Amino acid sequence: MKRTLRNPGNSSTVGDVHDVFFEYDVSNVGRKRPRTKEEGYYESESEEDEDQILNKEKKEGQSEDMFSDTSEDEKRTLPNDEAQKRRDFIENGDAERLAHKGLRNKEVLNDDSDDEDDNGKYSKLRYEDIEGQEDTNQANDLDADEEGSEISVPSSPKRMSFNLKEDMEEGDFDENGNFIRKNYDPESQYDAWLNGSVSNKKSIAAAREAEQKRKEMENRRRNQELEEFSKLPFSTVPEALSFFIARMERDESILEFLQRQSGNKKSYKKKKNNTAEGISPERKSADAFRKKLIELITAGLTFLEDKIGKEDIYSETRESLQRIYQKLTSNSWSSPVSYDDSNSSQYNFKWEFDDKTYGPYTASQIQAWSNEGYFTDAKHAAFIQLANMDEWMYPNNICFCDVVSLKK
């Protein structure tokens, strides 16, 4: 019988062959039940017997986890050969070999945790007992791999080399080979004072002695500074400021002023003038005066740092010192000596390796020649002295407006 798709009610006989479209007939579609495959166990016409089917299932079951907990229902369904095989596997020590390769049994982990919680009491291993075990374990793993095992563990963790002596300093190994780190902190002795636990009488005495020595050194340094300050040509801060302002140029810092006083920019050719060293007496005298002047300047800077509390005094300019002077005295700074004073001191000058001395001249005349570069642009070095003094000086070391400081 054949039923058409357009008219399912009509049917016609077309031989004994069923039409393929018959199963798509809507009127004949009902609930489909899952079909049960009866292959393997109960098919009598199968070519495989029951023993061959069980062997096939054994091979498929080898991919499962051997260490998973097996319920009682599963144990009943397992064949006797499979259960016996698992018992033989554990008794032969294969599980222990896998544990060395990184697999840990759940029961072993629980036992280890119980040992660690036993009030921290454990048996320590000596260095001689531990040394060489790393190589032994690696050799055992290699032997096991060569013999071959029924279950292979891919991507097992690699062993990392370590320094046993350093580890023994940081902790100890118990009987099971577990490393237990020490709680001692070598830096804790430096932080003990934070907890108020410093009660050692010897340490307290040493700290008191160190504090006393520090105070003695501070007092000694202070007394030395006061002794140096007593030799200065000034005793107050305004006098010290006036000393520097009178010698500095416009927009010149103290550091630049100190460099200018330290040496001449131009080097002169030294000629031998009946002296063994080839240095004139005037130059020796000028060098000695320059050395005293540099010591006086540095002592004056220390005096200002101590009195006004400025640590960056070397960066101060002439104008900034004038502002400090005005703030302290409420008056603007003015030159202590006038160039036009007829009673001002007289100066002499001479050229190096020249026996003739020129002068005396007033301070205004010497200052005018110095500003024009008469002394600095000459072929030979020039030296200037006060008429009533024996010392010779370089032109850049003279302050024409503060003769009193130079005499000291």
Curated annotation (Swiss-Prot):
Coiled-coil zones: none
GO cellular component: nucleus; U5 snRNP
Pfam families noted in UniProt: GYF (PF02213)
Compositional bias ranges of the Acidic residues kind: 41-52
Biased composition (Basic and acidic residues): 53-62, 73-109, 119-129
Domain of life, source organism: Eukaryota
Gene3D superfamilies to which the protein is assigned, alphabetical: 3.30.1490.40
Ranges for domain GYF: 344-402
GO process annotations (BP): spliceosomal tri-snRNP complex assembly
InterPro entries in alphabetical order: CD2BP2/Lin1, GYF, GYF-like_dom_sf
Region (Disordered): 1-161
Family: Belongs to the LIN1 family.
Protein's UniProt name: LIN1-like protein
Originating species: Schizosaccharomyces pombe (strain 972 / ATCC 24843)
